[in-house]
């Protein structure tokens, strides 16, 4: 994981109270539950001098502590996965009885929810259904290891990145492609990635590739590779150790410097379009996370993720 290049939010110094002030659901969730911040940032930052006994202040107190519905797969470790036991790291999965979500995304969700004065709950959905779920008000935000691609930006807005990394390729041990040192060496190989993600899109950067039909999840992708249905599979290199541990018989391709995928893996929080004040609050929360804190959260997720 490379947090050194993660952009920092310039406005964060003027909204330092965002992490300390509880925000009412009335001010954040309007128009059928979509994220719309009413009024000014002063309301979010707690800059006003409203009398504690005033009706508006009482309403705010009653509505604070509302839920932030966070869309994710809960099947994409170490970003997010489903757990059976509650812990300090988990949040409930709203649409799966007795289940919880854990992972790096969940730790980010906790901090975003704190900035918005809400309690986070996960909503488990297929990755390719997340944007539609946001548009139809099934969820309030997407925190699911989602890359802010130009295509997705046509439908939703994104925060600053909370994760950056690189893409790689796995092949089966003993494969003729195991000793490849450039993408060109994979010419003619059948390569598979996860549906609806950059892991599928970057495959087209391999000259002469046989681009296979994408599969719903990373476990499906790696299983296809192990079973010989594909010659290679794309993956996020920051997850390499965990994937190798739980998927025997696969090995990473070691590209020469500058000969691998040029794209950078990024993940950002997705929100409905037009919610600039909410994005500012989210970006402020992310800017308050140092590189060291992000690395600690990532390392913790790697240690806890299921095998």
Labelled PLM ranges:
Residues 164-173, 241-286, 302-307:
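Periplasmic-binding protein-like
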Residues 47-57:
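Bacterial lipoprotein signal-peptidase II cleavage site
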Residues 25-29:
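N-terminal export leaders
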Residues 49, 198-212, 252, 283-307:
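Ligand-binding clefts/hinges and TM-proximal coupling segments of bilobed small-molecule sensing domains
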Residues 119-185, 260:
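Acidic, polar ligand-binding/catalytic clefts
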Residues 64-145:
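Extracytoplasmic small-molecule ligand-binding "clamshell" domains
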Residues 1-23, 34-43:
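N-terminal secretory signal peptides
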Residues 145-155, 202-205, 231-263:
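A ligand-binding cleft/hinge motif common to bilobed small-molecule-binding domains
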């Amino acid at each position: 994981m490379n947090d050194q290049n993660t952009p920092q939010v310039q406005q964060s110094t003027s909204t330092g109270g965002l992490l300390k002030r509880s925000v009412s659901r009335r001010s954040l969730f309007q128009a059928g539950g979509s994220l719309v911040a009413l009024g000014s940032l002063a309301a979010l930052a707690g800059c006003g001098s409203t009398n504690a006994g005033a009706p508006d202040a009482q309403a705010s107190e009653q509505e604070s502590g509302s839920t932030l519905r966070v869309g994710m797969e809960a099947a994409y470790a170490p970003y997010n996965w489903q757990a059976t036991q509650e812990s300090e790291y988990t949040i409930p999965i709203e649409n799966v009885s007795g289940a919880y979500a854990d992972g790096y995304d969940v730790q980010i969700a906790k901090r975003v929810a704190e900035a918005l004065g809400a309690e986070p709950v996960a909503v488990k959905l297929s990755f390719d259904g997340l944007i539609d779920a946001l548009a139809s008000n099934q969820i309030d935000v997407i925190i699911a290891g989602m890359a802010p691609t130009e295509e997705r930006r046509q439908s939703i807005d994104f925060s600053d990145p909370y994760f950056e990394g690189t893409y790689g390729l796995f092949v089966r041990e003993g494969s003729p492609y195991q000793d490849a040192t450039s993408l060109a060496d994979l010419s003619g190989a059948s390569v598979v990635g996860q549906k609806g993600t950059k892991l599928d899109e970057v495959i087209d950067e391999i000259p002469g590739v046989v681009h296979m039909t994408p599969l719903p999840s990373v476990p499906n992708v790696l299983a296809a590779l192990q079973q010989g249905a594909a010659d290679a599979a794309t993956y996020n290199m920051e997850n390499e150790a965990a994937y190798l541990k739980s998927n025997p018989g696969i090995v990473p391709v070691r590209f020469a410097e500058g000969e691998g995928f040029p794209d950078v893996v990024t993940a950002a929080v997705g929100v409905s379009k037009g919610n600039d004040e909410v994005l500012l609050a989210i970006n402020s929360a992310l800017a308050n996370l140092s590189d060291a804190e992000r690395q600690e959260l990532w390392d913790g997720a790697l240690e806890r993720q299921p095998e």
